[in-house]
Design a protein with these regions (language model features):
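Catalytic-loop region of hydrolases
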Residues: 1-47
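Cap/lid segment of the alpha/beta-hydrolase catalytic domain
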Residues: 66-67, 78-135, 182, 186-204
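Alpha/beta-hydrolase-fold enzymes
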Residues: 170-265
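Short alpha-helix in the alpha/beta-hydrolase fold that links the catalytic acid
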Residues: 291-295, 318-329
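Short beta-strand/loop motif that positions the catalytic acidic residue
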Residues: 302, 308-310
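Catalytic active-site module of serine/aspartate enzymes centered on a nucleophile-bearing elbow/loop
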Residues: 324, 330-372
Length: 372
């Protein structure tokens, strides 16, 4: 399901060798921009999206007709002020919103690639997106920013291109995917692949869609984005439009109905194979391993200013995993700031209207811009 909209698309002509050993070329990267690039071309912020995000950071998403996924943070006068900054965000390769992914046709046989699409990594995503800098003639970004998988891309970007951003903002992220998170992703993948409509990844050619499996994958993942306290306060044991239990398997509880809804609407906007590929890329991410066990070496060549943000109730990428990045940066004398935001909204806090987070982000950017 490659959703067609009025896409801004860059066709990357240069061959890109992937970590799996395969090479791709003449491939599309779908992107969106907000604000204006100044004459010095030094006010650009490259935003990286999370697992189920896309290039539509702000404004209205033309597919869902809802606000962009980071509308609380990006826009005129907001934390990432588009009156001041030129914001770029692209759909990652492997995605389903216009960038090169498993729904694209194979250039050799004309068939939808499905699981013949090459396995990609966070490193591959970042190297593909780097082409946007050349496209806009940007020598150095003002900032790179992103949460969750977006934060992984932020870390990979500054490791790969140490002199290409003045500031670096990884949010609610990690330097390597834990066993717990690999387990949750595998649960989602198995739900998709167990759906009889998956057809070994060839469902598009068979006019089918593994929507039930994808919905379950989304439901399971969505739980990890929340917190126990937040769930209890919002739902508790409240019943869904009924006065008593029905002694069946319909959604008796509000939380059941909520998760089913999250699964059903997700199927309308996301592709099952893309979910497989992107979660696999997240699981393969291990910046420490790339540098033979020394995370500090990933950042030793950069003079960028880091600002790392975590949330108290995030159990998907807990504060300690963010602090490990801070420790690695401190060990090489890097310019690094860190803040832990108190909130009960869980991992998804970076996507929500959390005033302390938004004010902290805005203050860091504004101060850095004044110094700049």
């Amino acid at each position: 399901m490659n959703i067609e909209t009025n896409l801004k698309t860059l066709i990357v002509k240069n061959p890109l060798k992937l970590d799996c050993g395969k090479t791709i070329k003449d491939f599309p990267i779908a992107y969106e921009t907000y604000g204006s690039l100044n004459s010095q071309k030094d006010n650009a912020i490259l935003v990286f999206h999370a697992l189920t995000g896309d290039q539509y950071v702000s404004g209205t998403n033309p597919v869902t007709k809802k606000d962009g996924w980071w509308s609380y943070a990006v826009g005129p006068g907001k934390a990432i002020d588009t009156n001041k900054y030129f914001v770029i965000c692209s759909n990652v390769i492997g995605g389903c919103m216009g960038s090169y992914g498993p729904s694209d046709l194979d250039s050799e046989n004309g068939n939808i690639q499905g699981t013949n699409f090459p396995v990609i990594t966070i490193n591959d995503m970042v190297n593909a997106q780097y082409n946007l800098l050349d496209h806009f003639g940007i020598d150095k970004l003002f900032s790179v920013a992103g949460g969750s998988m977006g934060g992984m891309q932020v870390l990979q970007f500054i490791s790969n291109f140490p002199d290409k951003s003045k500031t670096v903002i990884p949010i609610a992220t990690t330097s390597s995917h834990s066993a717990q998170n690999i387990a949750f992703n595998e649960l989602g993948r198995q739900a998709i692949m167990a759906d009889s409509n998956w057809k070994e990844g060839d469902y598009s050619s068979n006019n089918s869609n593994p929507g039930k499996g994808l919905a379950v994958a989304r439901m399971a993942a969505h739980i990890t984005y929340l917190s126990k306290k937040g769930l209890q306060e919002k739902f508790g044991r409240k019943l869904q439009e009924r006065d008593d239990l029905k002694f069946g398997f319909d959604a008796d509880f509000q939380i059941e109905s909520y998760l089913r809804y999250q699964g059903s609407v997700f199927v309308d906007r996301f592709d099952a194979n893309s979910y497989l590929y992107i979660t696999r890329a997240m699981d393969y991410f291990d910046l420490t391993k790339q540098f033979k066990g020394n995370l500090s070496d990933a950042f030793k060549d950069t003079k960028a200013k880091f600002f790392i943000i975590s949330f108290t109730s995030d159990w998907l990428y807990p504060t300690q995993e963010n602090k490990d990045i801070v420790i690695a940066l401190n060990s090489i004398g890097a310019d690094v700031g860190f803040v832990e935001i108190e909130t009960d909204k869980g991992h998804d806090s970076f996507l929500l209207e959390v005033p302390d987070f938004l004010n902290t982000l805005k203050n860091f950017l504004d101060k850095s811009y004044e110094e700049h």
